[in-house]
Amino acid sequence: VLTNNWDEIVNDPEIDIVIELIGGIEPARSYILAAINAGKHVVTANKDLVASEGKKILATAKRNGKDFLYEASVAGGIPIIRPLRQSLVASELTEVMGIVNGTTNYILTRMTEDGMGYEEALALATKLGYAESDPTADVEGYDAGRKVAIMASIAFNSNVTFSQVYTEGITHITAEAVSYTHLRAHETKANL
C-alpha cells in the first residue's frame, strides 16, 4: 500500500505487518501503538524510540498477542537482541561490553593508529561515509547510550531508558590524550 494516510494502514485488514521507518519518538510511537492495537505486528530499527519507550510498546504488543521486533535498532549487522533474549536465559549477566558505534570506533582508531587529531579523523570518516552529515548522535555518545539502554533492559530484565544512561562524547579527546593512552599500552575505544 502506498499512501500518506496512516488510517488507511491501521484500518486495512489485509495488512499484517507494519515497518516503521520514520525515526524519532513522535509520531512513530503513536503510529506503532495504533498498529499494534489494530492487530498488526511491527518492525522497527528506531533506537531512539526503543530506548525510551521500548518496554511500554513491548507490553502493549504482548497484551495484543503481536510481535514488536527491533533487532536492527542495536548493531544492525550483528544479531544481539535475540541472543540476549533467548540464549542467555539461564546465565547471570554481570556486565555487557562491546563496541557499539562504528563511527566513534573508526575515529578513535584513526587517532590511535594514525596519530590523527579528532577533526581530521571525523572529516575522513565523513568523507568515507562512516559518519552522518550531522554526527552529533555518534560523537556525543547518544547513539551508543540508546543501544546500551536497549541491551541493558533485555540483559538485566529491567526498564533502562536512555535518560538513565551516562554518556560522554569523544569530541574532547585530543591527539595528545590518545598518544599518552597508547603509550601506556591501553587502547582508547568507545566501550560499554
Regions found by a protein language model. Name each.
Residues 1-37:
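N-terminal glycine-/serine-/threonine-rich beta1-alpha1-beta2 phosphate-ribose binding loop
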Residues 20-22, 45, 52, 71:
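Structural motif
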Residues 36, 62, 126:
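Anion (oxyanion) recognition and catalysis
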Residues 36-52:
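ADP-ribose/adenylate-binding Rossmann-like module
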Residues 47-68:
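Rossmann-fold NAD(P)-binding glycine/threonine-rich loop
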Residues 54, 67-180:
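Core active-site phosphate/anionic-ligand binding loop and the adjoining beta-turn-alpha structural block
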Residues 181-188:
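Conserved small/polar residues in nucleotide/adenosyl-binding loops
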